[in-house]
């Protein structure tokens, strides 16, 4: 029997901490090396978009998304667990490396802190997850223009908190995420 090495599937997520929008996970198996891969947060939007297309053309991949309602109903950890399982099912027979320090109870997954900046497959997954999520938030900004999603992508910026105070939550806000001043009673 030949000693075949399993391909590496890099896995990362985007949207673990925002107040609005989906949690998006991606798994990527590169067919060939791609120059310029690194943690998506260190790339410009233009460079991320260019690399997104290159990754799609040169990799096997699976992207899974959990809506704000699913995040509220299941919790972040359960969504991450289900996402890892979905990626394993879609990209079978790989070694799986997830950025971070927890496998969320999923077998046959290794973890590495900052893998999105160290391992090309995880960098590619980081790019697919972030671009997918950012594009969705830009679409949501057209439906809910008062929140400015196209700018902050649902993260808890000052402008986003101010919009929440003025307009309250919309359909894509995570109700399980508490916002100071919105969810706590005030004295006045």
From Swiss-Prot:
Belongs to the RNase HII family. The keyword Metal-binding applies. It catalyses: Endonucleolytic cleavage to 5'-phosphomonoester. SUPFAM superfamilies: Ribonuclease H-like. It comes from Sulfurovum sp. (strain NBC37-1). GO terms for cellular component: cytoplasm; ribonuclease H2 complex. PANTHER family: RIBONUCLEASE H2 SUBUNIT A (PTHR10954), RIBONUCLEASE HII (PTHR10954:SF18). Its main location: cytoplasm. The gene is rnhB. CDD domains: RNase_HII_bacteria_HII_like (cd07182). InterPro entries: RNase_HII, RNase_HII/HIII, RNase_HII/HIII_dom, RNaseH-like_sf, RNaseH_sf. This is Ribonuclease HII. It is found in: Cytoplasm. Its EC number is 3.1.26.4.
């Amino acid at each position: 029997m030949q000693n075949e090495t399993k391909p590496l599937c890099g896995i990362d997520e985007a949207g673990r901490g925002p107040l609005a929008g989906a949690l998006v996970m991606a798994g990527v198996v590169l067919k060939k090396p791609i120059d310029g891969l690194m943690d998506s947060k260190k790339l410009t939007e233009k460079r991320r978009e260019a690399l997104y297309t290159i990754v799609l053309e040169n990799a096997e991949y699976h992207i899974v998304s959990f809506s704000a309602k699913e995040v509220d109903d299941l919790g972040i950890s359960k969504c991450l667990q289900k996402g890892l399982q979905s990626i394993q099912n879609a990209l079978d027979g790989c070694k799986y490396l997830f950025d971070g320090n927890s496998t969320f109870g999923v077998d046959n997954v290794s973890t590495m802190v900052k893998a999105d900046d160290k391992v090309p497959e995880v960098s590619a997954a980081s790019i697919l997850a972030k671009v997918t999520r950012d594009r969705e938030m830009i679409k949501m900004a057209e439906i809910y223009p008062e929140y400015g999603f196209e700018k902050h992508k649902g993260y808890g910026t000052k402008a986003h908190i101010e919009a929440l105070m003025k307009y309250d939550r919309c359909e894509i806000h995570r109700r399980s995420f508490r916002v100071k001043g919105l969810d706590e009673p005030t004295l006045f």
